[in-house]
Amino acid sequence: FELGFPIALQSSMISISCLVLQGVINSFGESVMAASNIINRIEQLVQQPFSSLHAALTTYAGQNIGAENVERVKKGYRQSGAVAAIFGLATIPVAYLFGENIIGAFVKDAEVIAIGTKALHIDSLFYAVVGMIHVSRAVLNGCGDTGFAVLNGLTEVVCRVVYSQVFTRIPFIGYWGIWVTTAATWVTTAFVCVLRYMSGVWQPEKREAKRKKW
């Protein structure tokens, strides 16, 4: 319960923030809604390798932190981060060269294809950042840093709500603010994740020292 509940709460909070963003998306009409749905499907496909890496790294981190082998956890983090970054960066040329064809495979409406293609161009620049979120969360969750799960979920909620209200109301951005919001949320969340990892509070000796302090 101590490990599972914060992670479940994190997922719930993220889902709530997505619903808030969906409300903003719906306000821009059918073409934007259709393009957003397609981008979400593509994003789900892109995140499959990240999710698999996340699951494997969570187990790896848990086993090694249990054996008090912190250096192996750090090595796993670095190597997994490199894999995630390479995969994420590799999606950029694919999105820019074949984006229109990819969106066209889902829909034939010219306006939706145009919106979806540009949206894919925006988001693909930040898929490597998504990979770092998965890698960082995997290590932190695997090492039992349960308090962070709630903090991280709250970060996503606040970012999606605030950014969506700010960016979509800027006249020269308009509905493109939907995808700018997504990218900005990823960057902020990744920053918080990496910062938490670098703080080292997930390491057993530091957690124990913190408990004694309190």
Where are these regions (language model features)?
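Short alpha-helical transmembrane segments in multi-pass integral membrane proteins
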Residues: 1-5, 61-126, 169-214
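Hydrophobic faces of transmembrane alpha-helices in multi-pass small-molecule transporters and flippases
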Residues: 1-20, 24, 45-49, 53, ...
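Membrane-helix interface segments
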Residues: 31-32, 146-147, 174-175
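Short runs within selected transmembrane alpha-helices of multi-pass transporters and secretion channels
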Residues: 51-55, 123-142, 148-163, 177-194
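Helix-terminus/linker motif at the lipid-water interface of multi-pass membrane proteins
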Residues: 12-45, 63-64, 101-110, 166, ...
